[in-house]
């Protein structure tokens, strides 16, 4: 069995975030040697909803996400973050990220798997 690392959902990014969303959506990225998933209508492909609108866009529509731009903190420092909340998710599942896709993916993971999750160690940078 492969080793896992506990990661806060708000810190998930890259392959680890894509993997967590894939688990929720029912895709097993770890079975294929190149971490590719069989996606209906696409075949085997790199599933990357946190960076690819082809995969992340439908999730935003599915969960009816609303986004809010956080331009600066109370000191006026630029944050450039988006917060995302899915209309079909608990209110406390709101998450932030530097892009719409990352914020939405983190919110999905937080709503379905919680504040922290165990991720295969090989997916952590």
Per-range role (PLM):
Residues 1-125:
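Glycine-rich anion-binding surface patch
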């Amino acid at each position: 069995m492969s080793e896992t690392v506990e990661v806060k959902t708000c810190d998930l990014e890259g392959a680890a975030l894509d993997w967590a969303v894939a688990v929720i959506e029912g895709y097993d990225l770890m079975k294929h040697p190149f971490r590719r998933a069989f996606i209906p209508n696409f075949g085997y492909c790199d599933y990357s909803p946190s960076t690819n609108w082809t995969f992340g866009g439908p999730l935003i529509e599915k969960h009816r996400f609303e986004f809010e731009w956080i331009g600066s903190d109370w000191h006026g420092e630029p944050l450039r973050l988006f917060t995302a909340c899915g209309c079909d998710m608990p209110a406390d599942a709101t998450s932030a990220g530097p892009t719409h896709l990352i914020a939405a993916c983190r919110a999905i993971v937080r709503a379905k798997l919680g504040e922290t999750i165990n991720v295969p160690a090989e997916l952590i940078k």
